[in-house]
Amino acid sequence: MNDNYMINPKKELSQCFIHSTDITDKIVNYAGNISNFSIIEIGPGLGTMTYSILKKNPKKLISIEKDSRLLPIHDKIIKEFQGKYEFILSDALDIDLRNIAKPPVKVIANLPYSIATLLLIKWINYINFFHSFTLMFQKEVADRIIAQPNNKNYGTLSILTQLFADVYKMQDFGPEIFSPKPKVFSSVINIVVLPQPRFDVNYDKLRKIVKITFNQRRKMIRSTLKQITNNTDEILHSLNIPNNLRPENLSIKQFCDIANCI
């Protein structure tokens, strides 16, 4: 569909293009019904996923792309889907998505891996704006997002995401679906936002606690919490949390309980 455009992927932008519409159709299908939703795509690249989204007739699709070389491709798509497609030439990290789309909103994207985690953390700050996310991550990052306690992948991303959403891994993909082929495997996950957070907690306080404890994840929780409070032993005792546990052993609720005591 874009054979006339010879675009060499830029390594500094983490560009890995998906050429197969069979793959992008499958990813978009994982997002479920999109006909009544505003859809946001990050890093549309050559437009393969863009076409897959537009074929499912969303209320509107807005794509954010940093690489100006891709403008001719997307100008063509804009003309083909008049009124349905908007293209924004910008860095997604600089945009508050609340300013460009009207709810209900779903995000569907093959994220640039170099900024994928930063984007997710940014969106969590206003996650109630979204209905859901269907996102391609590096498999290692996806495994961290969906991890449960007592798992080596469990950490900050797991807790902050799952406080606000149900998370599901939909499919793993090998490097062969991309051009150029990355050195890592990839995964598509669905993040479905809950009507309310699982637990009542001050998010900024929770984030600080989680960040400090998981930065020293091999240390016992009683040791790392002393960087935040002088009442570590009393707090853990009042919550019936053994003080010899490591952060990966604590549930999201236990972290929220600790935050509410500090």
Curated annotation (Swiss-Prot):
Keywords assigned: Cytoplasm, Methyltransferase, RNA-binding, rRNA processing, S-adenosyl-L-methionine, Transferase
CC per GO annotation: cytoplasm
EC numbers: 2.1.1.182
Catalytic activity: adenosine(1518)/adenosine(1519) in 16S rRNA + 4 S-adenosyl-L-methionine = N(6)-dimethyladenosine(1518)/N(6)-dimethyladenosine(1519) in 16S rRNA + 4 S-adenosyl-L-homocysteine + 4 H(+)
Binding site for S-adenosyl-L-methionine: I18, G43, E65, D91, N110
Lineage: superkingdom: Bacteria
Compartment(s) where it occurs, according to its Swiss-Prot or TrEMBL record: Cytoplasm
Key word NADP present: no
Example GO molecular function: 16S rRNA (adenine(1518)-N(6)/adenine(1519)-N(6))-dimethyltransferase activity
PANTHER family per the UniProt record, alphabetical: DIMETHYLADENOSINE TRANSFERASE (PTHR11727), DIMETHYLADENOSINE TRANSFERASE-RELATED (PTHR11727:SF7)
Role this protein plays: Specifically dimethylates two adjacent adenosines (A1518 and A1519) in the loop of a conserved hairpin near the 3'-end of 16S rRNA in the 30S particle. May play a critical role in biogenesis of 30S subunits.
Family affiliation: Belongs to the class I-like SAM-binding methyltransferase superfamily. rRNA adenine N(6)-methyltransferase family. RsmA subfamily.
Name the UniProt record assigns to this protein: Ribosomal RNA small subunit methyltransferase A
Organism: Ehrlichia ruminantium (strain Gardel)
Lineage of origin: Bacteria, Pseudomonadati, Pseudomonadota, Alphaproteobacteria, Rickettsiales
Encoding gene per record: rsmA
